[in-house]
Amino acid sequence: MQVSSLNEVKIYSLSCGKSLPEWLSDRKKRALQKKNVDVRRRIELIQDFEMPTVCTTIKVSKDGQYILATGTYKPRVRCYDTYQLSLKFERCLDSEVVTFEILSDDYSKIVFLHNDRYIEFHSQSGFYYKTRIPKFGRDFSYHYPSCDLYFVGASSEVYRLNLEQGRYLNPLQTDAAENNVCDINAVHGLFATGTIEGRVECWDPRVRKRVGVLDCALNSVTADSEINSLPTISALKFNGALSMAVGTSTGQVLLYDLRSDKPLLVKDHQYGLPIKSVHFQDSLDLVLSADSRIVKMWNKDSGKIFTSLEPEHDLNDVCLYPSSGMLLTANESPKMGIYYIPVLGPAPRWCSFLDNLTEELEENPESTVYDDYKFVTKKDLENLGLTHLIGSPFLRAYMHGFFMDIRLYHKVKLMVNPFAYEEYRKDKIRQKIEETRAQRVQLKKLPKVNKELALKLIEEEEEKQKSTLKKKVKSLPNILTDDRFKVMFENPDFQVDEESEEFRLLNPLVSRISEKRKKQLRLLEQQELKDEEEEEPEGKPSDAESSESSDDEKGWVEEVRKQRRLLQQEERVKRQEQLKEDQQTVLKPQFYEIKAGEEFRSFKESATKQRLMNKTLEDRLKLEAKHGTLNVSDTTVGSKQLTFTLKRSEQQKKQQEAEKLHRQERKNLRRSASHLRSRPRRGRPFH
């Protein structure tokens, strides 16, 4: 049993603890219970309350005697008898179950909706009948007055199957492309279906007409919520004649009064996960909403959180046992969850002993084995002068010594050595002073940059020095004394930012690896101290190391996920604060100062270009010909020739004039060599 408390509400997990394999014999099970404390203290409320791999849905019959659950693999349904606290029967199915409904007060009439469009009926003896619906189904509800089953799924139609006549009736045509969930009000029979567009359509089964539409997707968007996609309806539940709760795929729960199209309250789970199920707890006016990560219990009037439940594995379904404080969960694991919350109500009558058990735990919250006793050997008794108490009720024989009351031990110790407390006090003071001295010296050696990293490296080096396996452990160079990494502890640019996203995501993995390395060093030390034996140690099986490594991997994966969720929440809060600042900020025009000696002509040129673009082509050609940029001439064959001259800037004109003057100056300074004539050569000219 595991006890957790949130908002001073205690939650008892009755399904936690180690489970024994089925193939173990009774003798080995009893031996394990004697040796293992966790196995001995576990509570198996219902025998074999688990599935082979995963549990998908779980429900309780109306009379409260039977608990039915479906799961895989292979697809099956299991029925548990609460009066016998054991499994009553198990039936394997052809395909996985999407959802099911118990039509009778006990388990004698059950309807299953499969993921391959089949609808399967079971009676008390077993399989009874099977039929199919036109499209894949996602949910269904049973209307008791007319004996109609309403199926919704990947279609705009709501299929109706009458169980009295044994045939399909005309379907209800909705305005949605697909429907996800549905529910029927037990008081007045109103049928409601949740669509993929985020709407809830309400129908009257008596006249088969739509009587109202609620736009939940629009109402779920609030100032505090952050929605990135269109919310679809993922859960639907009626409470009484006028109340209805709607869960969306973005993690919001909306409470409606059927007389209004506006929600009374919008509750956000802050996880962004689809709402799996919604339940009402009338005695305390609570709403229990669950997604795949958490079950939240909050007040339906104010929305104030009452308590929450976060299991180890993802949730598939949640069932509240009627008129009690017991909660059943279907998880992504073989074990099905059983939780008892005494504040919600008493324990069911088939497990009324839970009330007495929880009361005893509340009276003795810290009662652990031998906490109030001191273990002493026979030599210790001789030193204390208590050998005459051997065999009396004051001493309890255990192994090679005795257990005695801790208060009696302190009294006798004080009488034998009155100055023991003073000596103990002086030793403690001396130890504290030595520790502070060691820390003081260590702090002086730490660099200015990356002090925590340097402290971690120093601790690892000290552990290596203390280790007795210096030959077996491969010695690695110390980063602190290596000149290649010297800048990392001197330059502030290399400071590790512990608030960055990369550090927070990698830190759980690094810490797990360091812990695993320390654990391996301790194990190697223990092995060297013991005699070298080829046989396996007795207290631990051969696959224990692999199981521990897998547990470590699961642990750091959960820590990384937790850090990622915290980062997302911090990012969401920053965006909300930035949005509030932007809303409060008043924008003002900005002015720019032009340097002295420059002329601002951008507006004028843009206005001139705009006027030029508004003119016709003929006017633009005339204007360009006037400025000399366009030259039109006729050719001999009757065609026209256009020559465009690009405008030059002032700088280009100045540069061209300077080049012209330079060429003229060089021409004047040049000495001509035309007066020099060479002699004519003899022979034929070279060709």
Swiss-Prot record:
* Disulfide bridges in this chain: none
Modification sites for N-acetylmethionine? M1
Task: Tell me which domain of life the UniProt entry assigns to the organism this sequence originates from.
Answer: Eukaryota
One cellular component GO annotation, for this chain's record?
A: nucleolus
Q: Which residues carry this modification: Phosphoserine?
A: S25, S475, S514
The answer to keyword Nucleus applying to this record is yes
The UniProt entry annotates WD repeats at 50-90, 174-213, 228-266, 270-308, 310-349
Keyword vocabulary terms for this entry: Acetylation, Coiled coil, Nucleus, Phosphoprotein, Repeat, WD repeat
Segments carrying the region annotation (Disordered) are 526-560, 643-687
What segments bear the compositional bias annotation Basic residues? Answer: 663-687
Coiled coil ranges (UniProt) are: 423-476, 514-588, 639-672
Q: Which subcellular locations apply to this protein?
A: Nucleus, Nucleolus
State where composition is biased (Basic and acidic residues).
647-662
InterPro entries referenced in this protein's UniProt entry, alphabetically: Beta-prop_NOL10_N, NOL10/Enp2, NOL10_2nd, NUC153, WD40/YVTN_repeat-like_dom_sf, WD40_repeat_dom_sf, WD40_rpt
Modified residue Phosphothreonine is at which positions?
A: T481
Among PANTHER family, the record links this protein to: NUCLEOLAR PROTEIN 10
Per the similarity annotation, which family is this? Belongs to the WD repeat NOL10/ENP2 family.
Name of the protein: Nucleolar protein 10
Give the species this sequence originates from.
Answer: Mus musculus
